[in-house]
C-alpha cells in the first residue's frame, strides 16, 4: 500500500487515500462499535476541519480512548479515505503495532492518544 502525504484540503477534495495532519472541532459524542474486519473496539465521532466534516475512527483496542466532547479542538494524524455519499473517514489515528503504516494520533488538550 502506498500512502501519499499531501495538503489536507487536497486530500479532502480528492478520491485516493492519503496520510493527513489537520486540526478540527469535535461535533458529536463518540459512539463505540466492534469492527467486523479488525475484530477490535473502535470509537467514532464527527469533526469539522477547515475543509469540511470528517468522521474520525480510532481503534481503542490499540490506543487509549480519547475522551472528546462536542466543541473540543483536536489535532489529528491518520489516513483519510473516501466513502461515496458520506463525509471522508480518517482512521489509523493510533500507532501501528505491525509497523505497516505510519503512526497516527489524536491530540486533545496537549495529551497525545496514539
Please place each PLM-identified region on the residue numbering:
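OB-fold and OB-like single-stranded nucleic-acid-recognition modules
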Residues: 1-114
Amino acid at each position: 500500500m502506498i500512502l501519499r502525504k499531501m495538503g489536507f484540503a487536497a486530500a479532502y477534495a480528492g478520491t485516493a487515500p492519503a496520510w493527513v495532519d489537520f486540526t478540527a472541532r469535535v461535533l458529536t459524542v463518540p459512539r463505540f462499535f466492534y469492527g467486523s474486519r479488525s475484530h477490535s473496539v473502535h470509537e467514532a465521532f464527527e469533526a469539522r476541519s477547515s475543509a469540511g466534516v470528517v468522521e474520525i475512527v480510532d481503534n481503542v483496542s490499540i490506543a487509549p480512548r480519547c475522551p472528546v466532547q462536542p466543541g473540543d479542538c483536536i489535532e489529528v494524524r491518520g489516513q483519510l479515505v473516501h466513502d461515496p455519499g458520506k463525509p471522508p473517514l480518517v482512521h489509523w489515528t493510533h500507532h501501528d503495532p505491525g509497523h505497516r503504516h505510519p503512526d497516527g494520533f489524536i491530540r486533545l488538550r496537549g495529551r497525545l492518544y496514539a
